Amino acid sequence: KSSDTQDLPGSGGQVVAITSGEVGYVFRQDQIIRMDFVGGATIFRFSVISPNRGAVFGQTVCQDNRQIFFYASDGFFQINGDQVLPIGAEKVNRFFDSDLNKAYTDRITAAVDPFNTLAIWLYPSKDNPNTTGICDKMLIYNYVTQKWSVAKIKASQIFKQFVTINTVELMDIISENLDEINISLDTPYWTSGHLRLGAIDENFKAAIFSGTNLEAELETKETELFPGARANITGVRPIVDASANVVIKTRNKLADAVTSSTSSSMNDSGINPVRQSGRYFRANVKIPA
């Protein structure tokens, strides 16, 4: 065993987080340093991989093995070896910057859900007065599909935790009635030694994300169905596994305000009847909880 003392290179502000693993990363407010074990007299080698960008707060950094995700003053990023890659450039960063309650940025927390390959940031939105320290939204990044989503949830903290061993004798601690447990006993959830996403809820109690599904809302990108021509839509067929409500949004010029249809319910044929004409279209689909 060996150790030493070294001064960090550069002037990147306070150290806010340090990640572990085969390679370590030291996050400062305006700098990221890679830490490699090399042994000998040097022991650890420190290399600056981001001289002008760091983490806003330590709790905005999360990790799944060698995949590191963090929120900086200019958006969301992922570390891949020596590369700091933007993952929220343009639309995601703009949305988060406009939706965040900037009076309480210190309450942003991040965690990884390795079971579902998600990097998640819990934050207070502009619609939340946040006087009690409770956040109300999660920004979610699937680092396999590279897709983003938003969830409305009230919590003060999120974190990843190990699932402990579960036996028939211990099930009474969870519930005295097995029929009231809403997680199938056949799922890998009950296997010990796996990491799962946990939270401190709005009542400041430890919780897990095992409840019933929330309402899902999807909106397609804006599309010109027939380039250079108008179109008329009379129905939409959502490919979903439940009943859904659809709103069609249209405009004739990109400078125009968006016009929305009334919400349409799915009929017995799986089609949502609508009647909307225009040049540019997008569909908003809501799937009930």
Regions found by a protein language model. Name each.
Residues 23, 31, 67-68, 75:
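Generic structural signal for coil-to-beta-strand starts
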Residues 2-8, 45-50:
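A short beta-strand motif characteristic of beta-propeller blades
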Residues 25-50:
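Surface-exposed extracellular loop regions of Gram-negative outer-membrane beta-barrel proteins
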